[in-house]
């Protein structure tokens, strides 16, 4: 929608769209929105021009990873077809993937142009961008095996058997189609079903489950550009400018989905009391959680 220039010199533009679908590769569904709001004003004498813009495009899309340690082999593609996705399966009947990208990076800017006289122009711009999101993946081991092991996939379809992972993590007994089985036990220290126990379990299984984590790559970006242009002659123009900006990167990992477990034992910080900390809070990577870029993540 666009008003065109109105009598007071103002103009307003607005755009909003949505797209969703399934990718060519199995298990690569996607959903995205796009929004744009623009306001402009020009003075009657044409000396001042102001523009205010806010735009962004929150999106999520499931992926087929090319990670060396977590991807299908040529034999897998020969067996399951070229669209096969090693990270894909169904959880409670819904598509679920180890790998999901999610991001929202809105940007707001204010631009001002001022024609001081016929040979002198001043322009200034201030902008603010907030990026929030990242990508998900597996973390943990079960019986010494990583999530990339074929024992956690259906031999007929090649899909990850998510429901069995949930049953195993939650102490209900996971039984995979390939014959592997495991049942998590209650953690003595917490009384909960905890994944990533550092000790051998009572049945000798090294580690005891998987969860989905998210690696966050967020940022705050603020800046301003100011330029003064002076035309001295037909052959000589002077420009004086200022470019100020500040950037803060926010990089960490968080729990995305516990897959039936009550928590995850974290050993990544040597300052933890007792050498570890149990994490129970999860943060969703669903599209609906991306709109508010100022919330606690």
Please give the residue ranges for each predicted region.
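Transmembrane beta-barrel wall of Gram-negative outer-membrane proteins
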Residues: 1-20, 25-64, 107-116
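Short N-terminal secondary-structure initiator segments
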Residues: 15-35, 104-106, 210-227, 276-286
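Short, glycine/charged-enriched secondary-structure capping and boundary segments
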Residues: 28-30, 67, 121, 139, ...
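Acidic/polar loop-and-plug regions of large Gram-negative outer-membrane beta-barrel proteins
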Residues: 40, 49-111, 135-214, 276-293
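Outer-membrane beta-barrel transmembrane strands
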Residues: 92-137, 204, 208-243, 250-251, ...
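Signature of Gram-negative outer-membrane beta-barrel scaffolds
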Residues: 211, 237-297
